[in-house]
């Protein structure tokens, strides 16, 4: 089971399986909509921040489809190396942030931030709040933070390719929770943590975001499972 991404093998395993799962409909359209990527003048827009960019396929997609500049950061040097080698783009800057700091960015210079499947990897709520606070410092007034995670109300439910947690188990906030992604490329097991909807909302509100809202997202169209699979939490700087 993967608990960190500091080896090239772990990063490549993650990239291979998430690509095979067809990542784009897995909550990402709602993220892009929240950041108004399709309606913003890309020539004059400030860059987008991707906090926890992983192997970079989302960032290249944003650059290619929407023409937006992206600053993509990750604590894993292996993920950044993989992103630079496989998903480079003139509009995307990849940066390794081993200490999770964003000090290289100025105050209020970012036009929006996405952070996908990152807060659910954090073992304590104080860390979640601190990361959101660091992000908020970089955002222009009125800019949006869009946080995407799997839906905590669907723990234990088997979707087409994904299951979070064990069936019939009751989790408490902060409990370790195994995520299992099954594709034709193999089985990927990830170490995540259980957090309620209210915990994610708290992380943004405690960091100073306002107008915090939630959206309960269904699985991709090809998956008929009648439960929300993803949770999007949005807040305005």
Curated annotation (Swiss-Prot):
PANTHER family linked to this entry: TRANS-ACONITATE 2-METHYLTRANSFERASE (PTHR43861:SF1), TRANS-ACONITATE 2-METHYLTRANSFERASE-RELATED (PTHR43861)
Matching Gene3D superfamilies: Vaccinia Virus protein VP39
Database matches in InterPro entries: Methyltransf_25 (IPR041698), SAM-dependent_MTases_sf (IPR029063)
Record function comment: Involved in the biosynthesis of the antibiotic indolmycin, an inhibitor of the bacterial tryptophan-tRNA synthetases. Catalyzes the methylation of N-demethylindolmycin to yield indolmycin, with S-adenosylmethionine (AdoMet) acting as the methyl donor.
Enzyme class label: transferase
UniProt keyword annotation of Methyltransferase present: yes
Catalytic reactions of this protein: N-demethylindolmycin + S-adenosyl-L-methionine = indolmycin + S-adenosyl-L-homocysteine + H(+)
Record-given protein name: N-demethylindolmycin N-methyltransferase
E.C. number(s) listed in UniProt: 2.1.1.328
CDD domains membership: AdoMet_MTases
GO biological process: antibiotic biosynthetic process; methylation
Keyword Methyltransferase belongs to the record: yes
Gene inactivation effect: Cells lacking this gene accumulate N-demethylindolmycin and are unable to produce indolmycin.
Residues making up the signal peptide according to the UniProt record: none
Annotated gene: ind7
Family listed: Belongs to the methyltransferase superfamily.
Annotated keywords: Antibiotic biosynthesis, Methyltransferase, S-adenosyl-L-methionine, Transferase
GO molecular function: methyltransferase activity
């Amino acid at each position: 089971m993967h608990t960190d991404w500091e080896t090239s093998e772990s990063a490549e395993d993650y990239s291979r399986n998430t690509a095979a799962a067809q990542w784009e409909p897995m909550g990402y359209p709602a993220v892009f909509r929240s950041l108004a990527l399709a309606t913003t003048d890309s020539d004059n827009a400030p860059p987008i921040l991707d906090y926890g960019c992983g192997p970079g396929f989302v960032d290249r997609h944003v650059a290619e489809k929407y023409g937006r500049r992206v600053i993509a950061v990750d604590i894993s040097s292996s993920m950044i190396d993989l992103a630079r080698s496989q998903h480079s783009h003139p509009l995307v800057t990849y940066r390794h942030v081993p200490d999770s700091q964003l000090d290289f960015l100025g105050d209020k210079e970012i036009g929006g931030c996405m952070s996908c499947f990152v807060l659910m990897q954090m073992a304590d709520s104080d860390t979640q709040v601190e990361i959101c606070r660091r992000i908020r410092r970089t955002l222009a007034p009125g800019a949006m933070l869009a946080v995407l995670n799997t839906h905590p109300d669907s723990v234990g439910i088997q979707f087409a390719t994904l299951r979070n947690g064990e069936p019939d188990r009751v989790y408490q906030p902060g409990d370790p929770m195994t995520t299992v992604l099954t594709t034709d490329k193999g089985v990927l097991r990830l170490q995540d943590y259980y957090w309620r909807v209210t915990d994610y909302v708290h992380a943004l509100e405690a960091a100073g975001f306002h107008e915090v809202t939630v959206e309960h997202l269904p699985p991709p169209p090809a998956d008929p499972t009648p439960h929300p699979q993803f949770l999007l939490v949005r807040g305005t700087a």
